[in-house]
């Protein structure tokens, strides 16, 4: 059960989230892996989760009718949000807003086929008061098995 050096799913998700549109085209995604990227901004954490889940489903990163895939994605999203919000997933309740780029990557990071597929969610952007200029950069990463 070795993690393949060229198949680091979390690193790939982070690079995609950090990359500008022109930079993401030069990243080498392992064969058979799926991914999507997007942007979301809101004071409502439910909207942030819903936007990422919708992107993953509409880009066929996860199957819409398989519960375990949606469940794995949800937990990876929540883990990434914990990183961005420093463990407090409240936004509007404490007058915070986020503007994030996200990447969702699905693949097989381990040598052994028995380890199966994993999903990684990376978030990068800003968090702060809902006043222009009152925010700072934040980053989060979540990884879960499917």
UniProtKB/Swiss-Prot annotation:
UniProt keyword Transcription regulation, yes or no: yes
SUPFAM superfamilies per record: Hut operon positive regulatory protein HutP
UniProt-listed InterPro entries: Regulatory_HutP (IPR015111), Regulatory_HutP_bacillales (IPR023552), Regulatory_HutP_sf (IPR036482)
Chain coiled-coil ranges: none
Xref: Gene3D superfamilies: Hut operon regulatory protein HutP (3.40.1510.10)
UniProt keywords, alphabetically: Activator, Histidine metabolism, RNA-binding, Transcription, Transcription regulation
GO MF terms, alphabetically ordered: mRNA binding
Any Pfam family: HutP
Gene Ontology biological process terms, A to Z: L-histidine metabolic process; positive regulation of gene expression
Description of how the protein assembles with itself and partners: Homohexamer.
Family note: Belongs to the HutP family.
Task performed by this protein: Antiterminator that binds to cis-acting regulatory sequences on the mRNA in the presence of histidine, thereby suppressing transcription termination and activating the hut operon for histidine utilization.
Entry protein name: Hut operon positive regulatory protein
Gene: hutP
């Amino acid at each position: 059960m070795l993690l393949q050096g060229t198949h680091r799913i979390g690193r790939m998700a982070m690079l995609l989230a950090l990359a500008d549109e022109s930079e993401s085209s030069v990243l080498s995604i392992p064969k058979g892996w799926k991914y999507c990227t997007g942007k979301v901004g809101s004071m409502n954490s439910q909207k942030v989760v819903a936007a990422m889940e919708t992107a993953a489903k509409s880009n066929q990163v996860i199957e819409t009718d398989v519960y375990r895939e949606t469940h794995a994605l949800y937990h990876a999203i929540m883990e990434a949000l914990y990183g961005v919000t420093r463990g407090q997933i409240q936004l509007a309740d404490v007058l915070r807003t986020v503007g994030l780029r996200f990447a969702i990557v699905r693949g097989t990071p381990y040598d052994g086929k028995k380890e199966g597929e994993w999903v990684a969610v990376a978030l990068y952007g800003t968090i702060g008061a809902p006043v222009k200029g009152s925010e700072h950069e934040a980053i989060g990463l979540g990884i879960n098995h499917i």
